[in-house]
């Protein structure tokens, strides 16, 4: 079985960043070789700090009603109480998505571009849309390219280009 990994990269050209999802086979090229190769091509890896992760959450509540937050993992395993509260809020969002506001409030302590306290987020389609994606803070991406193109790229574009 051939499992391809995907990694999100940004490329700066004409005074703005563009984003691409690069697939790679870990049996053919190592992670470090991939990073090195793309650096030589003037691309940089996208790291998802907590601020970017929360911007993705806000996007599901404000601009993009096609996708919802299905799971979120805090990086520190010592903070079980916070993780349990987050899990409860996300569970409540299944019946009342307006609880996303509670989730954003619960995460306000880590809304920082120097924080990586949110280690992963899972986004799924709603209303019969079965697309799903999981994003790790190191920019590794599991999921549908449709979510990447239609949901994640617009958030990254606003965040990195100030649009």
Residue ranges and their predicted role:
Residues 1-163:
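Intrinsically disordered, low-complexity, charge-rich terminal extensions
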């Amino acid at each position: 079985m051939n499992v391809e990994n995907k990694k999100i990269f940004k490329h700066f050209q004409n005074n703005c960043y563009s984003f691409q999802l690069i697939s790679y086979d870990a049996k053919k090229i190592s992670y470090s070789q991939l990073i090195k190769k793309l650096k030589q091509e003037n691309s940089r890896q996208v790291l998802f700090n907590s601020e970017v992760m929360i911007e993705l959450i806000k996007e599901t509540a404000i601009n993009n009603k096609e996708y919802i937050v299905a799971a979120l993992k805090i990086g520190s395993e010592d903070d079980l109480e916070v993780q349990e509260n987050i899990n409860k809020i996300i569970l409540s969002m299944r019946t009342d998505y307006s609880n996303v506001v509670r989730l954003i409030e619960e995460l306000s302590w880590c809304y920082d571009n120097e924080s990586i306290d949110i280690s992963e987020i899972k986004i799924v389609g709603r209303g019969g849309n079965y697309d799903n994606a999981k994003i790790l803070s190191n920019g590794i991406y599991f999921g549908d390219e449709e979510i990447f193109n239609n949901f994640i790229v617009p958030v990254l574009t606003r965040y990195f280009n100030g649009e």
